Amino acid sequence: MAFLSEEIDEPDTIYHEGLNASLSDGVPLPFVMSVRPFEPDDPWMLDRRISQMRAEGRNIFDSMKIRMASDPAAGQAVALEPTSYFKGLVTNEFCLREYQACDGLSVDGTSRAFPLSMVPKLSRSRMSNHIGATSLAFDDDGRLRLCVTGSAAAVAAGKITSSAAGSIDMADIAGASSLTQAVADAITRELVEETGLDETVAVETRIIAFVRHMERGGKPEFIGVSRIRGRWADVGNSIDDAERPFTEGHVVLDAAALGLDGVGRWLAEQSGHTSYALRSAWEFLFHAHARQNSALPGWVGISTV
């Protein structure tokens, strides 16, 4: 296990180099889905917290999600359970916060996420831990299309972020032959919604990393690299009205011309305007690209310099 961030003001992300190398090589993760849904320790807090957020003007709605109930390992089935977006709001999203649940009762979200100041295995975690996914998407010319998050976004509003980000829905897992396939399918769906990608365009996504985000209670996330067939200028349409509050616009970088180092310098220059999700995803892409015998350089068409 390793920590990605070495900066004091950056969140911490933990990962396992061996697992990520296996994912980059295309080794699938099988899964076993439970019918028993996850329940938070204090289910009564759900209605109270949702009512508070809606009273604050937050336009939130619930949806079914997929929870990781065991740590991933190459060749081993990952245990999954049904959960929901709202259940994450009273578990993972309380991390680094103290929540006044009611008169006389204060909930320390950090202690619940990390009992005894330790990061629990996913099998022992009492967080909702619904699975997230993010991707960097390149076209045939090596151009990278990034999103600018809108004011309604729950995370990193107004920041430049990755090409697509979201979470795994029940529909993504139905019929999937592996968890990694379900993640890739979810990323394709998010690309259509967030970049305006024509849904008839072929997309190939390779999963390159699995991480857990400490500032969100150890929430699990997969990082991918996507290749679209065509040019963003031709297949990147405008987003629909429902997505506009969440995606304000787009930034396109000529990554093939800039090279990995050039994009890295651009990210450093724009550090105040970019999300941690984008910076960390690029770091994992850089590591996967540099691995001996990596297929990424030829696949995305980007050199180091």
What are these regions (language model features)?
Residues M1-R189, L197-V305:
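N-terminal leader/linker segments that precede catalytic domains of diphosphate-processing enzymes
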Residues E194:
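Short alpha-helical functional segments enriched in proximate histidine and acidic residues
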